[in-house]
């Protein structure tokens, strides 16, 4: 999947590990939404 920036990763994508994965239809079972605001499309989820 496409990596995304979780709230716990830091304020910006520069120099931070992107620990989330974008899911277009919501987070699958066993995953949770790790970003409070965004992304614009889909959800940023992590295990």
Curated annotation (Swiss-Prot):
Compartments it resides in: Secreted; Nematocyst
Matches recorded under Pfam families: Toxin_4 (PF00706)
Cystines in this chain: 4-44, 6-34, 27-45
GO BP of this protein: regulation of signal transduction
InterPro entries: Anenome_toxin, Myo_ane_neurotoxin_sf
GO MF annotation terms: sodium channel regulator activity; toxin activity
Coiled-coil positions: none
UniProt GO cellular component terms: extracellular region; nematocyst
Keyword terms, alphabetized: Cardiotoxin, Disulfide bond, Ion channel impairing toxin, Nematocyst, Neurotoxin, Secreted, Toxin, Voltage-gated sodium channel impairing toxin
Main location: secreted
Superkingdom per UniProt: Eukaryota
Function description: Binds specifically to voltage-gated sodium channels (Nav), thereby delaying their inactivation during signal transduction. Has a longer mammalian heart stimulation effect than Hk2a, Hk8a and Hk16a.
Family to which this protein belongs: Belongs to the sea anemone sodium channel inhibitory toxin family. Type I subfamily.
Name this protein carries in UniProt: Delta-actitoxin-Aspp1b
């Amino acid at each position: 999947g496409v990596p995304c920036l979780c709230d716990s990763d830091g304020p910006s994508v520069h120099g931070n590990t992107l620990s989330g994965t974008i899911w277009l239809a919501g987070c699958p079972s066993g995953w949770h939404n790790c970003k409070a605001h965004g992304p614009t499309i889909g959800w940023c989820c992590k295990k």
